[in-house]
Amino acid sequence: MTASNLSSRLRIGQLANRSAGLRPDLLAVASLIQPGEKVLDLGCGEGDLLRYLQDNRQVVGRGIELLESSVLACVRLGISVRQGNLQEGLRDYPAGSFDSVILSQTIPYLNDPSFIIKEMLRVGSRAIVTIPNWGHWRCRLSLLLTGRIPQAPGLPQAWDAAPRARPLTIRDFEEFCDRQGFASAGAIYLQGKRTIPDRFDKDLRATTAVFILKP
């Protein structure tokens, strides 16, 4: 294990002790954010991550969210949020407006993920993207034994539910980034709440992955 991986594990553990309510991938994201950063959270939901980062990292945080009920929840928390889809929300920001732009568990629902990530890297110094991993061994076994499309770990949604998710694996996303020329600045692989090493079998073992991308 490298020193950076050990440091990341320690930070995630410390954050988990203070915020048991955040999803494991959001705790991993929080461990990457430095105090005082300017942060944009795409598809920020009800603002749990932004509120946590404002309280514990003193970030200048903004969110973009489509659902009106989630936008209202953010407003009640005092979070700066705009309602709209990601393409409309991103185009209004000048280049270099943020230190980190976050996209958590949303990639499977995007019609044009390449465009969104390019926009993230335009307005931010880095993009932090978390994905559910349909390549996890339980998903593979479920497909083999039942003949049905499996639900991704942490994403309990039937294949015909709206909005519809496009299944992807860690390997799929890594190859996608290579094709699009997105430079990787590191990744965190999670098995539930626990981080696992970057090994040949990570696509089998990880339930979620957090990727850091640079322009």
For the regions a protein language model found, what residue spans apply to each?
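Class I SAM-dependent methyltransferase SAM/SAH-binding core
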Residues: 52-89
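Conserved alpha-helix/loop element of class I SAM-dependent methyltransferases that forms part
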Residues: 20-36
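A short SAM/SAH-binding and catalytic strip from SAM-dependent methyltransferases
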Residues: 100-111
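S-adenosyl-L-methionine-dependent methyltransferase catalytic module, highlighting the catalytic core
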Residues: 114-119, 126-215
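Glycine-rich SAM-binding Motif I of class I
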Residues: 47, 51
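Class I SAM-dependent methyltransferase Rossmann-like catalytic core
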Residues: 7-21
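Class I SAM-dependent methyltransferase "Motif I" SAM/SAH-binding loop
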Residues: 43-45
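Short conserved loop adjoining the S-adenosyl-L-methionine
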Residues: 89-95
